[in-house]
C-alpha cells in the first residue's frame, strides 16, 4: 500500500487548519483588568472601508488664506493619495473643490479602534513634509538639495557609527541629488563643516561632514538625547516617499460618517458568508464525497489566511483596509479555490471510473489536475499584478516594474482597485497552499486509512454498477447559433444603454456635496425621496454622521453631475426638508462643487490596465498552448470575454446603478473569472490533442474536450453563483440595495462566463479554423 503510514498527515493538517481558522477569526487576546493585550489580531481587528463600517470626513483648506492654483490643488491631491496608500488606507474618496480651494477627504475609521488614530493620520496627511538638506545648522542655510531629488527613503534599524543599533532613515538620491550631495560633502569635508536636515521647519538631524559622499546615498539619524523610534522613521520615510505638499494645509472641518452601504452591511455579509459556506460544504460533499469534504476544510483555511493577511495577523504584514471591491477579490479567490479542488476531484473520479486502483487514480488525478490549475491561476496573477502596479503607490515594487506602461499618466493611485488586486493576489497564491498542497496532503492521508480506502468515497461508482454514458452535446455543431446569440445579446445591451442612459457616480462626473445639520432621528430613505424631488436628481446618495468639533449630527448629500448647485437650490432643499420634517431642524453647514475623484485619466488608465492584462494573458496562452494554435485561441477567449463584460455593464444599466469604483471592480472580477474558465477548457483540448493524435479533426477534438470540461465548469460556477445568490437574498432581506446592486451584476457576469467558456470562445476558435482551412484549400485549387 503506497500511502501506508501517512494517516497522521490527515489529522495534523486538519488540526493545524482548525487552529489557524480559529485564531484568524477570533484572534488571541488576554484581558488584564480594563486593559486588553492583543497577541494575535483576528477578523474583528480588520479595518473595514467606509462603505462597510463608516469613517471620517475631513475638509482641508490652504493655510493663511493661500490662493492655490488648480495645478497646485491637483498636485496636493496626488501627494495625499500617496500618503493614504502608504498608511494602508486604500478605501478613500478625495475630491477637489477648485472654486473654494478645498480638498474633501473621506477615509475609514471606527470609534473604539485602537491601532489607528484618525487625528494623527489627518495630521500626517496634511503636513507639508518639505525635506531640505542645508549647509550649516540653521534653517536659512544654503540649500543643497530637497526632497524632489530623493529617489527612495526606507526605515532601517542597525548600527550606524558604532556597535549600538538604532533606528534611522536610509535615503537614495537621483542623479541630480547625488551630484549635489557629493559636491557639498566634498566641499564641507575640507573644512569639517556641517549639514543639517530639515523636514518643514523642524531640524531632524545635524552632522559634521567627515568624508566626501559620492555614492548617491545618505542616512538621517537622531540625536543621542532624543533617539528615533520605529514609528518615527517609518512615518518620516513614508512622508518623504509621498513627496511634499505644494502648500501648507489646515483642517477646515472634521466629522464622522456612517457606512455608505448601511448600518447592518457587515452583519449581512457575515451571515451571507456563513450560509454560502454551509451550502458549498453540502454541495461539494454530495458531488465528490470525501475529497469534496476535505476540500471545504482547505477552503476554510484559505479564507482565514486571506483575512489574516488583511487584519495584521502576521506582524510582518501591516493591516489593510477591506472594502467591497476587496471582498470581490476574496470572492474571486474563493472561486479559484473551489475550482482547483473541483478539477482535482473530477480527475480522480474519472481515473477511478476508467478502472484504475485508488492509489493510481490519486497519483494520476493529482498530476493531470495540476497543469490546468497552474495555467488558470497564472492568468489571475497577471491581472492582480497589473492592477497593483497601475493603481498602487508609485514607489511600490509592481509600480516600478510597470512604469514603462503607465508613465504617461504620471504617479496616481486608486486605493479600492489596489485593494482588489491585493486581496486577489493574496487569495490566489494561498490557493496553491490550501487548494493544492493541503487538500492533497489530506486526501493522501485519508487514503492510507483502511476504513477510508473504499473507492466510492472518492467518486467511483459502487461495485457492480456501470458508469452511465452521457450523450455528448454537439457544441461545435451549434457554433453559429451560439455566436448569433452572443451578438444579439451585446446589441440589445448597447440599445438598452442608449435608451435608458448610463448613470455615472460622483467619482466619475464630479458634482456637488451638500452638508446639513439636523436634530433627532431621521429615515435616510424618506429624506432621500424629498431631497431628490427638491434637487430634481434621482442619483443622490446620503450619509449621516457627527461633527467632531460641535457634536452636531450631519447629513452629507452627494449629487453627481456636471452642473454646479446654487445657493437657491440649497435653500429650496432646506425649505422642502423642514416643511416635511419640522422636528429635525435641517440647516446648511457647507456646499462644495467638486471635481471627479476618478475622472477621465482614471478611466483611461483602467482601460490601458485591462488591455495590457489581456495582452499578457494572450501571450501566455499563445506560449502555453502553442502546439494547438494557442495565439488564435487566446484571441478568441479575449473576444468572448467582451460578452461577459457587456453583461455586467448591461446589468448595471438595467438596475439603474451609477457606475463607480465598484463597477470597475466587478468588471475586473469577471475578467479574471471568465479567462480562468476558458483556460481550463483549453488545457483539456491540449491534453486530448496528445491523446487523440494530430489526425483527429479539430472540430471533433474541441467537441470532445468541451463535453469533458462542461461538468467541472458548471459546478465551479454553481458554487460561486450560489454564494453571490445568498448575498443577494440576504442584502434584500436587510434592505441593503447597495450590496445587491454589486453582487447581482457579478452573478450575471459569472453565468455569462460559463456560457462563453463552453460555447462562445471554442465556437469562435473552430469557426476561425474552418475559414482558415477553406482559404488554404482555395489556394491549393
Each model region followed by its residue ranges:
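A structural signal for conserved, well-ordered secondary-structure elements
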Residues: 1-781
Amino acid at each position: 500500500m503506497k500511502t501506508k503510514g501517512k494517516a497522521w498527515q490527515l489529522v495534523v493538517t486538519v488540526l493545524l487548519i482548525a487552529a489557524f481558522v480559529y485564531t484568524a477569526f477570533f484572534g488571541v487576546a488576554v484581558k488584564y483588568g480594563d486593559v486588553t493585550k492583543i497577541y494575535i489580531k483576528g477578523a474583528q481587528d480588520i479595518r473595514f472601508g467606509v462603505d462597510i463600517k463608516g469613517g471620517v470626513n475631513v475638509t482641508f483648506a490652504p493655510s493663511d488664506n493661500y490662493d492655490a492654483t488648480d495645478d497646485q490643488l491637483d498636485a496636493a491631491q496626488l501627494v495625499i493619495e500617496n500618503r493614504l496608500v502608504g498608511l494602508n488606507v486604500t478605501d478613500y474618496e478625495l475630491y477637489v473643490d477648485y472654486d473654494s480651494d478645498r480638498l474633501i477627504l473621506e477615509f475609514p475609521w471606527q470609534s473604539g479602534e485602537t491601532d489607528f488614530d484618525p487625528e494623527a493620520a489627518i495630521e500626517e496627511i496634511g503636513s507639508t513634509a518639505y525635506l531640505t538638506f542645508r549647509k550649516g545648522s540653521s534653517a536659512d542655510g544654503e540649500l543643497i538639495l530637497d526632497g524632489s531629488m530623493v529617489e527612495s527613503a526606507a526605515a532601517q534599524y542597525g548600527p550606524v557609527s558604532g556597535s549600538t543599533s538604532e533606528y534611522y532613515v536610509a535615503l537614495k538620491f537621483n542623479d541630480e541629488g547625488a551630484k549635489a550631495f557629493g559636491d557639498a560633502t566634498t566641499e564641507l569635508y575640507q573644512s569639517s563643516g556641517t549639514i543639517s536636515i530639515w523636514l518643514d521647519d523642524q531640524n531632524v538631524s545635524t552632522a559634521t561632514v567627515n568624508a566626501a559622499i559620492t555614492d548617491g546615498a545618505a542616512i538621517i539619524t537622531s540625536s543621542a538625547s532624543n533617539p528615533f523610534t520605529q514609528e518615527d522613521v517609518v512615518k518620516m520615510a513614508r512622508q518623504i516617499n509621498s513627496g511634499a505638499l505644494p502648500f501648507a494645509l489646515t483642517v477646515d472641518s472634521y466629522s464622522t460618517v456612517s457606512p455608505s452601504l448601511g448600518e447592518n452591511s457587515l452583519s449581512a455579509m457575515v451571515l451571507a458568508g456563513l450560509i454560502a459556506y454551509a451550502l458549498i460544504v453540502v454541495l461539494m460533499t454530495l458531488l465528490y464525497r470525501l475529497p469534496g469534504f476535505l476540500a471545504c476544510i482547505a477552503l476554510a483555511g484559505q479564507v482565514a489566511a486571506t483575512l489574516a493577511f488583511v487584519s495584521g495577523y502576521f506582524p510582518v504584514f501591516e493591516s489593510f483596509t477591506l472594502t467591497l471591491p476587496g471582498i470581490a477579490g476574496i470572492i474571486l479567490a474563493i472561486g479559484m479555490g473551489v475550482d482547483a479542488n473541483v478539477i482535482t476531484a473530477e480527475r480522480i473520479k474519472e481515473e477511478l471510473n476508467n478502472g484504475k486502483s485508488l492509489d493510481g487514480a490519486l497519483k494520476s488525478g493529482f498530476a493531470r489536475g495540476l497543469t490546468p490549475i497552474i495555467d488558470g491561476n497564472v492568468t489571475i496573477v497577471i491581472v492582480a499584478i497589473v492592477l497593483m502596479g497601475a493603481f498602487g503607490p508609485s514607489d511600490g515594487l509592481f509600480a516600478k516594474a510597470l512604469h514603462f506602461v503607465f508613465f504617461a499618466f504620471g504617479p496616481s493611485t486608486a486605493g479600492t482597485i489596489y485593494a482588489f488586486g491585493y486581496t486577489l493576489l493574496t487569495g490566489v497564491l494561498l490557493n496553491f497552499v490550501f487548494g493544492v498542497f493541503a487538500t492533497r496532503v489530506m486526501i493522501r492521508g485519508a487514503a492510507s486509512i483502511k476504513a477510508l480506502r473504499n473507492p466510492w468515497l472518492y467518486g467511483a461508482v459502487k461495485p457492480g454498477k456501470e458508469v452511465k454514458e452521457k450523450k455528448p452535446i454537439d457544441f461545435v455543431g451549434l457554433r453559429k447559433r451560439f455566436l448569433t446569440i452572443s451578438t444579439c445579446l451585446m446589441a440589445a445591451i448597447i440599445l438598452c444603454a442608449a435608451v435608458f442612459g448610463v448613470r455615472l457616480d460622483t467619482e466619475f462626473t464630479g458634482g456637488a456635496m451638500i452638508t446639513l445639520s439636523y436634530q433627532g432621528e431621521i429615515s435616510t430613505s424618506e429624506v432621500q425621496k424629498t431631497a431628490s424631488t427638491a434637487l430634481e436628481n434621482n442619483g443622490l446618495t446620503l450619509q449621516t454622521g457627527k461633527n467632531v468639533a460641535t457634536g452636531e449630527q450631519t447629513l452629507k448629500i452627494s449629487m453627481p453631475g456636471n452642473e454646479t448647485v446654487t445657493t437657491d437650490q440649497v435653500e429650496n432643499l432646506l425649505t422642502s426638508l423642514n416643511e416635511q420634517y419640522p422636528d429635525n431642524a435641517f440647516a446648511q453647514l457647507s456646499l462644495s462643487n467638486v471635481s471627479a475623484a476618478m475622472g477621465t485619466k482614471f478611466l483611461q488608465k483602467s482601460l490601458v490596465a485591462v488591455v495590457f492584462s489581456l495582452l499578457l494573458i494572450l501571450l501566455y496562452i499563445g506560449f502555453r498552448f502553442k502546439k494547438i494554435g494557442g495565439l488564435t485561441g487566446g484571441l478568441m477567449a479575449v473576444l468572448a470575454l467582451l460578452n461577459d463584460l457587456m453583461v455586467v455593464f448591461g446589468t448595471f444599466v438595467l438596475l439603474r446603478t451609477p457606475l463607480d469604483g465598484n463597477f470597475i471592480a466587478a468588471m475586473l472580477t469577471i475578467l479574471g473569472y471568465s479567462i480562468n474558465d476558458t483556460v481550463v477548457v483549453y488545457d483539456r483540448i491540449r491534453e486530448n490533442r496528445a491523446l487523440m493524435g494530430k489526425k483527429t479533426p479539430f472540430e471533433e477534438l474541441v467537441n470532445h474536450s468541451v463535453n469533458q470540461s462542461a461538468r467541472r465548469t458548471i459546478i465551479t460556477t454553481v458554487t460561486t453563483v450560489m454564494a453571490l445568490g445568498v448575498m443577494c437574498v440576504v442584502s434584500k432581506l436587510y434592505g441593503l440595495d447597495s450590496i445587491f446592486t454589486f453582487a447581482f451584476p457579478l452573478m450575471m457576469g459569472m453565468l455569462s462566463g460559463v456560457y462563453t467558456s463552453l460555447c462562445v470562445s471554442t465556437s469562435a476558435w473552430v469557426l476561425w479554423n474552418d475559414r482558415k482551412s477553406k482559404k488554404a484549400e482555395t489556394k491549393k485549387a
